[in-house]
């Protein structure tokens, strides 16, 4: 009954307008001028609200699963080294305590692969919805030793553009461009994966994953110096590159800041422990991202 009630609950527009009459943000496009002139959209990775913010009192979270929040204890895989009572993502929590925070997000995606599509306003088609679910369930995977002619590995993350289900009208990039909204992109939709070095390719050499062309509007407004998804690259380096290019492009007043700036900081995805490179725990990636 609750699901049916929620799905078919209709509230008059006048109620929403009345409740938000003192809100400076327009209720809908064209209602009034918005005080927001610039948006910096930062995309992150596979963390849930509760994992980081479950202990935040002003949010509706579950503190019992806030493994990257306050007073966390963790160990390496071999349980030979550990840390007790640490606050892992302290900057995230500080921002949440001092500024606005939103909870109860109900996303359209099931996993990361289709989530990156929704992120840039591309609707996954039937092929994607079935193949990604089968892949994540362990029942369908890419075979790097396949003998199929022209076999390529079409993988993706970082809000990439996928030819198999790209909207006829494009994604948010074309939408911004059509409506005269200036934007600039750091890291979205650009990803070159490493190659396969299996000895079965002794007659051909390395077999590479394939990338695909970016839409013109996005290519022209994308940084060529900002690193995309790769857990071997620290987010600290990404931020340094962002600051450097931000200052050179707009910080010195040469050009006006675009209305929309998109940035990807993906290392909260996590990866295997790399103690020799400063990542002795999986939590180390979260701290780097923080």
Task: Please annotate each region the language model reported.
Residues 2-290:
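N-terminal pro-sequences and low-complexity stem/linker regions of secreted or lumenal proteins
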């Amino acid at each position: 009954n609750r699901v049916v009630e929620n799905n078919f609950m209709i509230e008059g527009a006048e109620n929403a307008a009345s409740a938000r009459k003192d809100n400076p943000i327009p209720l809908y496009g064209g209602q009034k001028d918005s005080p927001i002139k610039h948006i910096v959209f930062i995309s992150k990775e596979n963390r849930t609200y509760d994992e980081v913010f479950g202990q935040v009192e002003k949010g509706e979270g579950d503190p019992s699963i806030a493994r990257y929040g306050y007073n966390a204890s963790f160990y390496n895989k071999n349980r030979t080294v550990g840390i007790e009572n640490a606050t892992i993502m302290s900057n995230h929590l500080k921002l949440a305590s001092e500024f606005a925070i939103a909870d109860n997000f109900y996303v359209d995606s099931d996993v990361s692969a289709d989530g990156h599509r929704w992120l840039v306003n591309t609707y996954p088609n039937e092929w994607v919805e079935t193949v990604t679910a089968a892949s994540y369930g362990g029942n369908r995977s890419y075979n790097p030793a396949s003998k199929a002619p022209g076999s390529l590995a079409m993988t993706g993350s970082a809000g990439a553009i996928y030819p198999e289900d790209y909207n006829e009208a494009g994604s948010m990039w074309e939408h911004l461009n059509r409506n005269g909204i200036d934007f600039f992109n750091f890291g979205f939709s650009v990803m070159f994966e490493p190659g396969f070095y299996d000895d079965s390719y002794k007659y051909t050499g390395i077999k590479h994953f394939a990338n695909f062309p970016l839409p013109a509007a996005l290519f022209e407004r994308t940084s060529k110096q900002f690193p995309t998804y790769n857990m071997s690259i620290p987010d600290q380096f990404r931020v340094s590159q962002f600051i450097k290019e931000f200052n050179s492009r707009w910080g010195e007043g040469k050009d006006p800041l675009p209305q929309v700036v998109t940035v990807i900081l993906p290392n909260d995805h996590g990866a295997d422990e790399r103690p020799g490179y400063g990542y002795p725990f999986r939590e180390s990636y979260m701290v780097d991202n923080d």
